Structure formats: C-alpha cells, structure tokens
C-alpha cells in the first residue's frame, strides 16, 4: 500500500480529486493484477504466470485513439466495443479491474489515515478478520439472549441506487459516468444482483468491481443502522457531524442545526426500541440481530427495518425476509451451521450431615451442527456423489496424474474439516470424509481400469494420510486415539482464527 500511495502522490489527477484520468495509467492495471480477485485476465500465458504489459499498452492506445467509452447501448449489440468480438470481453475485464482499483483509492487512503490517527488508541487484532471469530462471540453472548432476527439484506432494485450512493464520496463526475456505462452496458452478462440468491449475486467475470459496489452499499446501510442501534441501546449524546453531511440521510434533518436537536428527535423515535443487550452480526448478505428483549420488541425492530430500507434507501424488503427465532426453541441457520442454545442437566449429589439430596442444575450450552443435507447436495452438484450421498468417480479428473487427483481430493477434505472443526457433533463430518475418500478411490480405479478394492489394497495406509488435517496428524503422534484427552480434542469444538472465507462446497447460500 505504501508503493500505491507513492504513485498516487505523484499523479496530479489525484491531487485534484479527478479519478477518470487514472484509467489511462499503466500502474493502475499492475495493481489490479496484484490484488484483483480474478488475476488470470492479465496473464498472457496462464502456464507461465507472466503479467502481460503488452495487452495493457494496446488497450490504452485504443482508448486514446477512439471514443470507445462513449458508445451507446445500441452499439453494444453489434459487438464493436473494441472492434472484435473475442477481444471485447478481455478488454472489458481489464478496464473493470482497473476501475475497481481506482474507486477503492479514496476509501483505502481514508482508512489508512484514520488508522494512523487512532493507532495509539485502537488495539490491533488480526484474529477478528477470521469469520470463525463470530462463533466464539455467539458462545459468549447467545447464552444470555432470548430472540434472534435473521435478516436477508435487501438488494437494490435499480443499479442507479449504487451510483447515487457512491457519488457522495466520489466527486469526479466522469468516473461515475464510466461506472454507469459498466453497469448498464453489461448488466445482461450474469446481472450484478439477482433476487434468487441473497448474496451469490456476483458475476464471476467482474468480482472485484461488483464486490466493492455491494460492500460499499451494505457499509452505508450499516453505518446508519449501527448508529440507530447505539441510540436505542445507550441514548448517548455525541456528535454526528459526518452523518449530517450526507444529503440522502433523513431528508428532514437538513433543517436541523444543533446536534442536541438531532439526538433529541432520535430519542423520541427510538424510545420503544430501547434495549441494553442488542448485538448485530453480518456475513455476506445475511445478518443477525440478537436481543434479550421480548418478542414484541423484535417485531418492532422487524417492521422498523422494513420501513427504514424502503423510505431511506429505496430498497423493497418483504416481511418474510426477516425471521424471528427464539433461541431456546429454534436453531439458527447461519454460515453453513445449525446453531442453537440447549439446556443440559447437571445432577449434583449433596451431603449434609445425615441427609443427602440431589440438585439438578440446568446449564445452557451453545451447540453447532454441520448442515449435512445441503453439504451432500453440494458434493452431488460437484459430481463427487449422487443425490443420495453414494460416492461416485470424478470422471473429469481421470486425465490428471495420480498425485494430482489425490492432492485435489485431500485439499477439499482438509478445507472442509478445517472449516467445520467447530462443530460440536462431528459424525456428519466423518460422512463427508468418507464420501470424498471413496470418490477419490473410485476415480483412481476408473483411471487405471481396476476395482476399488484392488486399488486400495495396493496403495495401503499412505492413501489415507492425504485426508487427515495437520492437527489430526500431530494429535495421533502425541496422544493415542483411545485416551480421554485425545477423544476430547477430536470431539470438542475447535475454532480457527485464520479462516477468511467459506469453502466453495460449504457455501450453499
């Protein structure tokens, strides 16, 4: 990022808040290649992994020579965006990746400056980057809560909403026009946002740009929503000058001058929602609002959120997209886990002089279970098994080397084991390992035109080692499997703080 700042400081266009000229700079595409989600588009030869500066130079030259970016939607049907149909997709990919880097510039630098200013006050915690850090939070907080709102965040009904949201941060009109061009000219290529799936919404062709737009959209909503939650929880009188500067934030507030009046009005609006135990968690398009309050309070929050989205963000959300769950009776489906709070009885025998009696102490425990049916469905969709969970051979991999086939199956198995290690019941996970192990054996047997039994007999125990995680290997060397300590480590939940995404097979949302 320091190198990125050095380039930007030398560029006069950035000094005047003009982002559009940056799209003609070669180093922008270099950063897009280094940090983009789809790195293959700037590779001249994917086998050699070499960055093709020639493609970028040719693209910039074409943009200088002709007004390609001013073509209307009528011309896009003729596939003459850059003169050739097969180059159209490649050049669009490169520009969208570069434009994504450009739009991230003001927010990245703003974040760095804010962190540097507060470096002495804020404790740096890299562990909070892991999505597994959510579950220890659940274990600490959910035991004392009663209800949960499971929220599917609504998607923008019109792409212009995304542009309008961004224009309050990006003052360069040319860049915003270019963004509109990307969204409207290519919205038929696996559209930006689809209502069928809540957050499996991004075209894999433009992930960086679309992820940035959606995350920025959600961040804008959350910045206001978290402010409302703080007001309802603590009703503190603090300064909210940054929010007052935004035109679209509560239009009636433009006539308010004093922060006291601003805070007073929100106290009147939110007094029915007062709750000192309110917790908010989000991952992708799903969020959770947990409270210790009553069901009436949760219904108030539900319909307040619906009106809040519709009135102030032009987002249509139906009541059925927000579910109210009582933790003591219903499981919570979140991040490919079934989570619930269950009561365990602990009977203690007490002896007092000559009298003895039993004391039954109910203890709450946070329980997480692997969602086996959707996971088997994902394996079936990937052709590792049939819909009933019976392993089958992966025919498309039979052309690979034996070591590559075993490595691929083993990597998938280790990734799933790593992610689902926090499950309190691991029997379902053993079934997934069995499916992958036998599917691998059948794939190898099909390749060598042999039987599974004969192939397993020839490979021996070395074949199974690929399907063990590193933790299981270490534990098997240190502790015998029949010891009580080893059984506790194998069966107990184990959350990792280095997981930043859900494995593709685990992500069925």
UniProtKB/Swiss-Prot annotation:
Any one Gene Ontology cellular component term annotated for this protein: chloroplast
Keyword field: Chloroplast, mRNA processing, Plastid, RNA-binding, tRNA processing
Keyword presence, Cell division: no
Compartments where located: Plastid, Chloroplast
GO molecular function: RNA binding
GO biological process: mRNA processing; RNA splicing; tRNA processing
Keyword Cell inner membrane: no
Function summary: Usually encoded in the trnK tRNA gene intron. Probably assists in splicing its own and other chloroplast group II introns.
Family: Belongs to the intron maturase 2 family. MatK subfamily.
Name of the protein in its database record: Maturase K
Organism: Austrocylindropuntia vestita (Cactus)
């Amino acid at each position: 990022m320091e190198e990125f700042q050095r380039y930007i400081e030398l560029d006069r266009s950035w000094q005047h808040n003009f982002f559009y000229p940056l799209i003609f700079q070669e180093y922008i595409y270099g950063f897009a290649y280094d940090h983009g989600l789809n790195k293959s588009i700037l590779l001249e030869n994917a086998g050699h992994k070499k960055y093709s500066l020639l493609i970028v130079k040719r693209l910039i030259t074409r943009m200088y020579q002709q007004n390609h970016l001013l073509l209307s939607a009528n011309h896009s049907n003729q596939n003459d965006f850059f003169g050739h149909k097969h180059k159209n997709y490649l050049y669009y990919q490169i520009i969208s990746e570069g434009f994504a880097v450009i739009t991230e510039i003001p927010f990245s630098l703003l974040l760095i400056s804010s962190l540097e200013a507060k470096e002495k006050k804020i404790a740096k915690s890299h562990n909070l980057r892991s999505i597994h850090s959510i579950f220890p939070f659940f274990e600490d907080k959910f035991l004392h809560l009663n209800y949960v709102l499971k929220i599917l965040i609504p998607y923008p009904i019109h792409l212009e909403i995304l542009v309008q949201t961004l224009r309050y941060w990006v003052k360069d009109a040319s860049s915003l026009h270019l963004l509109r061009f990307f969204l409207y000219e290519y919205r038929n290529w696996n559209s930006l946002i689809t209502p069928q799936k809540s957050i499996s919404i991004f075209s894999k062709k433009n992930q960086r740009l679309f992820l940035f737009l959606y995350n920025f959209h959600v961040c804008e909503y959350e910045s206001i929503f978290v402010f409302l939650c703080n007001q309802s929880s603590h009703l503190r009188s603090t300064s909210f000058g940054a929010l007052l500067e935004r035109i679209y934030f509560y239009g009636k507030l433009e006539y308010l001058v004093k922060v006291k009046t601003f805070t007073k009005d929100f106290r009147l609006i939110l007094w029915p929602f007062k709750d000192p135990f309110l917790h908010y968690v989000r991952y992708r398009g799903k969020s959770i609002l947990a409270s210790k309050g009553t069901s009436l309070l949760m219904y108030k929050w539900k319909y307040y959120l619906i009106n809040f989205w519709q009135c102030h963000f032009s987002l249509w959300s139906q009541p059925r997209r927000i579910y109210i769950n009582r933790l003591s009776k219903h499981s919570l489906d979140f991040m490919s886990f079934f989570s619930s709070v269950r009561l365990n009885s602990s009977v203690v025998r007490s002896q007092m002089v000559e009298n003895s009696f039993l004391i039954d102490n109910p203890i709450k425990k946070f329980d997480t279970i692997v969602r086996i049916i959707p996971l088997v469905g994902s394996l079936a969709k990937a052709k590792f098994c049939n819909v009933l969970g019976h392993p089958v051979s992966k025919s498309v991999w039979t052309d690979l080397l034996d070591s590559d086939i075993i490595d691929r199956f083993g990597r998938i198995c280790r990734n799933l084991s790593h992610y689902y290690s926090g499950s309190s019941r691991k029997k379902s996970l053993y079934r997934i390992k069995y499916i992958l192990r036998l599917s691998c054996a059948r794939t190898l047997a099909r390749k060598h035109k042999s039987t599974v039994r004969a192939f397993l007999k020839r490979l021996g125990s070395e074949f199974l080692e690929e399907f063990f995680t590193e933790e299981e290997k270490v534990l098997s060397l240190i502790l015998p499997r029949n010891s009580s300590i080893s059984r506790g480590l194998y069966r107990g939940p184990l959350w990792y703080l280095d997981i930043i995404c859900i494995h593709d097979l685990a992500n069925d949302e």
